[in-house]
Amino acid sequence: LARQLDLPLLVSGGSNREYATWIIETEGLPAERVQLDYRARDTLGNFTSLVDEIRSRGVRHVLLVTSEDHLARSMAVGQVVAGSRGIHLTGVPVACAPDCREEGMVKRWGDWLRAVTWVITGRDIRDAAGPDPAWR
């Protein structure tokens, strides 16, 4: 997709660095158009660790490419975090069958609440409250 649309590619989390690098090289994407970022430990962190950097580059629209079973939660979190900085997201699902694992509503709404709290306070409530296995 990045090559078809001649867009820069930002990989944040998901697959390990070696696998991401292999795919990028296999697909023939120019290295100067690709940024790998592994600071985040979860979906909220994928957005909060990058949103201000993306905005400072003048980006106002992002294609969010992720597995179809993760897209709804990613969009819920991303629309709050990126939206707070004036960045629009368009979700692009990647098929995951037969390995799809549906993410529950508790996880989705929990991460959405974390995103809203981060926008208001600049902090992740998980850091203050301790880890809750239901949100992972």
Task: Show which residues each predicted segment covers.
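A transmembrane-helix-recognition feature enriched in membrane-embedded lipid enzymes
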Residues: 101-131
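A structural signal for short, hydrophobic/glycine-enriched beta-strand patches
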Residues: 1-106
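Trafficking entry modules
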Residues: 133-136
